[in-house]
């Protein structure tokens, strides 16, 4: 045994003593060495003893390092607590300033990221420290695995080169309530891709003219200079669907497909409350089934009658969360029940309530899409209600609802759950028209360029407008669809046109296009199909000759759109600011019977404070 090995043994003994091990368990260094050399000499394979010795030493050292590492996780997590969407909705971010460690969260500098940015999916998970009672001993570490589909913001297009703008209807509202969760519960700005302007606009109601007599839709136009860029004109297009009395709504066959996995534990009481609200509105001729998927797929109610609300509610109250997610198998069982209780001419619909984390079974997007599209052809639609945070899969739920001819909402609190379930049962979950498409042709003589604000996920090729086989959005009974365009008028200064359209040389191999001298500004076309039958689509055409006047509708919508531009840090936001839009919006509250507009001001102020 050489001097180096002797020194190693001395160091090892000292380290073991420093671990506060009882002294009587160890011999003196001299006795230990003597015994060591004696045993080593007797071993035919002395390397076994060395291995055992060093494994023991390594275990002792690693245990100490692990303790230090675990503590460092808490402290390193604090500075990023409000910089990513991993902030957990069920933990309030109001920390006690007296808490020595956690009080630093509210004062910690934000990570050097663009406003609303998010690490790309597939990057290392971000740890976030959340504490419900501002005590270190109760702190919990969560990982951010939320997913949002990337949005490439619409750009200005030249009417001379691209006079047609085509997109599908979208009456979803999930983005708005999800962003509210970030601002009010997470104390964080949302990731940019979580902000979909069309869902912000459609979260609110507007004073649109309603269809008369046997009309299915009305189209409303308004305009005003863009508050954030006066050289641009804002054009509002508001579509109003026919309202139907609740008594005249068709019978429903609802199949609730509920995720009861462990990730749903914190939000499950709200889920039960939301279902109870909907159960109260069931009519005697409505049917409801309940399927849960977690550790296993369970049918809790197989075709319960709306006349027996007590039985339905008892089944709802007995639900609980816990287990591993198996969404694919659950969806198969839900469609099986939907077919079993199918109502011809009725509202047959799967109602999915989940955080979107499908781990087992039909999990790939392609398999889910094929299944949902196939069942859609059988007049069984799918609506999605998202809940939860930290592991929320917005991209997957949005995709399923779009492919399933259904609507998509996010339930961030019990109040929203009650509101959504009440509204859904009076129209939104009852499809009035399917494959609703819009196409606007702008006159190059009047409009030099245009930009659609939002609807990035609903854009369509111009040729698809007249193709009835191309799927598009659905509009519920009495519902509204609102869209905003930014316009660069043909008589705008040349420097303004060049700013938004660029400086392109004249074409060399083709003659200039002939521009009509018509006094028309644009032609708006609305194409849709009736919910029943396979009759050809219907077409409605509206011609606008001049910029219409403004009302409270566009003034409110402009504030909502500006809010989304600020949250996304849009390259087209111009002089947009939270303060400016909040002042404008405060003058357009109107009756605000549901309190949504007043709450909007609260969200704007929260975002403004977070930005500072």
Each PLM stretch: what is its role?
Residues 70-131:
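Juxtamembrane extracytoplasmic segments of single-/few-pass membrane proteins
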Residues 125-129, 158-161, 165, 174-180, ...:
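Long, acidic serine/threonine- and proline-rich intrinsically disordered regions
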Residues 168, 234-236, 253-255, 437-439, ...:
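Beta-strand secondary-structure signal
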Residues 27-41, 51-80:
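Single-pass transmembrane signal-anchor helices and their membrane-water interface zones
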Residues 217-436, 495-514, 591, 601-612:
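Exposed acidic/Ser/Thr-rich ligand/metal-binding surfaces
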Residues 85, 125-242, 575-612:
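Subset of Sec-pathway N-terminal targeting signals
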Residues 184-189, 193, 197-202, 210-211, ...:
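Acidic, Ser/Thr- and Gly-enriched intrinsically disordered low-complexity segments
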Residues 5-52:
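Positively biased amphipathic helices and basic secretion/translocation or surface-docking motifs
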